[in-house]
Each structure stands twice: as structure tokens, then as C-alpha cells.
Amino acid sequence: MENIMTLPKIKQVRAWFTGGATAEKGAGGGDYHDQGANHWIDDHIATPMSKYREYEQSRQSFGINVLGTLIVEVEAENGQTGFAVSTAGEMGCFIVEKHLNRFIEGKCVSDIKLIHDQMLNATLYYSGSGGLVMNTISCVDLALWDLFGKVVGLPVYKLLGGAVRDEIQFYATDARPDLAKEMGFIGGKMPTHWGPHDGDAGIHKDAAMVADMREKCGEDFWLMLDCWMSQDVNYATKLAHACAPYNLKWIEECLPPQQYEGYRELKRNAPAGMMVTSGEHHGTLQSFRTLSETGIDIMQPDVGWCGGLTTLVEIAAIAKSRGQLVVPHGSSVYSHHAVITFTNTPFSEFLMTSPDCSTMRPQFDPILLNEPVPVNGRIHKSVLDKPGFGVELNRDCNLKRPYSH
């Protein structure tokens, strides 16, 4: 009889944070909105708060970067560790150290689904439909997958069943699709800058931006718009038709997460051939099932916000059953190891975090060491061939552990 590998139990879980409202600003890391001054990601981008003039110019003005980065580390009895990062900051640390720890410590490193289910059910009474609590659960889940991979000596994508393609090809999210084309990306997704409170003038300005980039990038380069929950159905429909002459590939997250009827109407009225996408700020498996039923073309969960890798795999299955694509919101290695195993993810997102979009910078810089970036718009699966998620925690960052147990 062959020997079966004996897996260790989890000895301890620890939680740190960096950046956010109670720490230094501009720390970057898992909270990629926490950038310094003069960064494209904070430059007059349309949001649900843009209708208030005092919060229109800057997303940081209404507090988009107050949470900061959460870092969760799990340690096995044999001394091996796994970790992950997300957006939950100091409040996420409290949830991990004072509540979720009881479901983690003492379990086998392979008990990921059991721990996941217990965390979800134990927080139902205060988690609502996602948000901070789900971000925290996601971070724990990713740390568990990282630890499991390191214990058995395999990359996470092989734990999921292996790659279905040799490489991942990327589009870039930034303000300069023309520069993204020069770097080898297959497309560029720009933020919108205007919303319903700006009327038809706002539509004309954003459509003119698309027209300008179409001229600069040529006919074959993908162009997309990210509307970040800032519109209503009528405005989004008019904007989609205004951009149709410039071959806009898709229009993204026009409406707040729970407006399912609005997404159904938008998909029904969008120009033929233009895709409607959403999902970045949906936080539960059930919400993605309902979103899928609206008939949108691409679901875009964030693996650090939707419940972790365990939930992302389930979301991909829902999308596949309906013939939909799942293209996760850019989450670096945490997305890479998942999407290379999904047959309904033919491309992925890379979120540019360099201030002017002119250079390649790892998305979660500086919190991850050895974080890969696309080369000529691609990452080969061999780059992912390291145990776990293949990155290490940069302990030189100003990590704070406000709670213990």
C-alpha cells in the first residue's frame, strides 16, 4: 500500500495592515487606490459621489483609500507559512484575530472548503452582501490556498487541476490605451470622467475621448470603458450608443451592484455587438448567480473581495453554464493562478499602477516580492511554477499588527 502524505495542521493565523486612514497615505499594496499625488487612478474619475461637486475631482476626497491593505498569514505546525493581501485594513485585522481565528487554527492545511463555509456562515449576521467582511474572508481563503500549495510543493493553478492554455494574455486598465498598445496589451480600458449629473455634455466628452483613442490606437485594438457604478440605465444606454461608431468592445459596471433589472435592460438596449460587463463590487456567490441571469456578457469578480479563490471557482462555473465569460477584476497572482485553469477566461485584466501609465509596475507593489508582470502583454504559465502563489511578503513595509489572540 502506497504511503499517503501526512499534512500538518494550522498552528496560527495572524493579521497585519498597512496604509489607510490610520496609517501612512500612499502605501499602495493590496489597497491599490492608496496611491500618492498626481496618479491617474485619482484623476477626476466618475463615481457615485461625483454628483457632489466637492467630491468630484478626486476619489480619495470621499475616502476611497481609507481602508488600506490587509495581510493575513497562516502558519502550519511544521513552520511553513502562507499569506495573502486584500483591501480591509485595520478592521479586517480585528475580524481575523477576534472572530475567524477559531475556524482556522487546528484545522488541516487542506481543510480550505470547510474553513471557508464556516467563515461565511459565522459572519452572515454582520456581513450583509459583501464588503469589508467578505474582503477579509477572501484574504484568509487566499492565504490558505497559498499555504496548501507551499506544503505540497505545487503552484495553486495545479491544485485547481492545471492550466488549459500556455499563457495568459492581458488587456490594460489605465488612462492611456495608446501606451498599453505599445507595451503589447490586446486592449485598453479607460475610466469614464462624467456622469448623469453632467447631462448630454458628459456623454459627448467621454465619447470624444473614445474617438480620440480609436484614432491613436487603430481599428484592431480593443477599447473599453469602466464606468465604476456612476450611471443610470438611460445615461449608460445613450453613452453606449454614442461610442458604438468607435467600436467600443464593452461598457463596464455602469450601475451599482444590486440593480439587476437595470443591467438586464442595459443589455437589451445596448448596441449590437457591444458587450455589457459587471461584477467587480458584487460580494457573494448568490449575487453572481442573479447577475448571470441578467444576461450580461462577462462577469468580473474580484478574487480578493468575492469570497476568495474558493468562491471564484464557483462563479466561473455559473458563468460557464450560461455561456458567459468570467474575467476577474485585476488581482495579480491571485487571479493568474485561477484564470489559467478556466476555459471561459480567454484573456485577463492587468491594472496599471504606475502614476502616468508609462511603465510596468506590479499591481500590489510594494507589498509582494517577486510579483510577475506581463511581458509584451502576456504571462507564460512557467512563470507561475512556484509553490503556492509564488510570491513572498515584503516585511520591510510598515506592517502593523493591532490585535492578537
Swiss-Prot record:
One of its GO terms (biological process) is carbohydrate catabolic process. Gene3D superfamilies: Enolase-like C-terminal domain, Enolase-like, N-terminal domain. Substrate binds at H33, R59, E349. The record marks E349 as: Transition state stabilizer. PANTHER family: ENOLASE SUPERFAMILY, MANDELATE RACEMASE, MITOCHONDRIAL ENOLASE SUPERFAMILY MEMBER 1. One of its GO terms (molecular function) is magnesium ion binding. This is L-rhamnonate dehydratase. It comes from Escherichia coli O127:H6 (strain E2348/69 / EPEC). Belongs to the mandelate racemase/muconate lactonizing enzyme family. RhamD subfamily. InterPro entries: Enolase-like_C_sf, Enolase-like_N, Enolase_C-like, L-Rhamnon_dehydrat, Mandel_Rmase/mucon_lact_enz_CS, Mandelate_racemase_C, Mandelate_racemase_N_dom, RHMD-like. Its EC number is 4.2.1.90. Its cofactor is Mg(2+). The record marks D302 as: Increases basicity of active site His.
